[in-house]
């Protein structure tokens, strides 16, 4: 199989928001193909440092080309766990990037089971050696749980989600991506417009299998402690659930006063932990050149000197 080509999304916009310079420490929490890390290293001085993190064991091989640079290091594991280990070691960072979702390496490899267009084992784990696979989940969960996952994580209409869940139960055990794709086809058909419903189903199952939203929340709470005052948080998301979580996290930490309007002074003690930055979308040119970038949304926030909120 030809090697997949991964193009980092919103590369220049992300690097401008990260604003790396001099001796900064920059954490690339979703290393992927290393495009963002390589670009940041070009901007740093000899005393700077980039820490790359990726849950996918195959990412370590892609990091080899950068490991010859003494300013670069790589840690393999879920980003929330790695970031909290860094917090425990007393480390700090000047900028931190999350480029969420899948890399082209993962989507285009049928052995990983992420794509409904490529037949392979029904796996979908970011780390194939860790935790239950998509097949394990779908072959064990009840109808209500499966339908809830499809609605919550894939924005599948509830009636459709129930039909798909019933069809999955009827066809169990599911073993391949084709098994799941055909269950979706039998349950709701293929719409000529509006996108293939299998795309949302596969997305929802993947998010559930990898606990992506839970991991993101824990990682953002770690980032809150890692970033120095003035530190830059940059998050590129591709799914409405991810974006809502990031937006809510930043809003909760903007320190907006909740006192009744009739009070002359603030007594609620609200203090901003982050200042909200810009929200950006990919340019028309980037979307034309790389259609996978179309749903991307980039949120930026700046750390203040206020103490971190209590972790959930």
UniProtKB/Swiss-Prot annotation:
This is Ribosomal RNA small subunit methyltransferase H. Keywords: Cytoplasm, Methyltransferase, rRNA processing, S-adenosyl-L-methionine, Transferase. Signal peptide: none annotated. The keyword Cell cycle does not apply. GO terms for biological process: rRNA base methylation. Gene3D superfamilies: Putative methyltransferase TM0872, insert domain, Vaccinia Virus protein VP39. The gene is rsmH. It comes from the Bacteria. Its EC number is 2.1.1.199. HAMAP family: 16SrRNA_methyltr_H. One of its GO terms (molecular function) is rRNA (cytosine-N4-)-methyltransferase activity. InterPro entries: RsmH, SAM-dep_MeTrfase_MraW_recog, SAM-dependent_MTases_sf. It comes from Rubrobacter xylanophilus (strain DSM 9941 / JCM 11954 / NBRC 16129 / PRD-1). Its main location: cytoplasm.
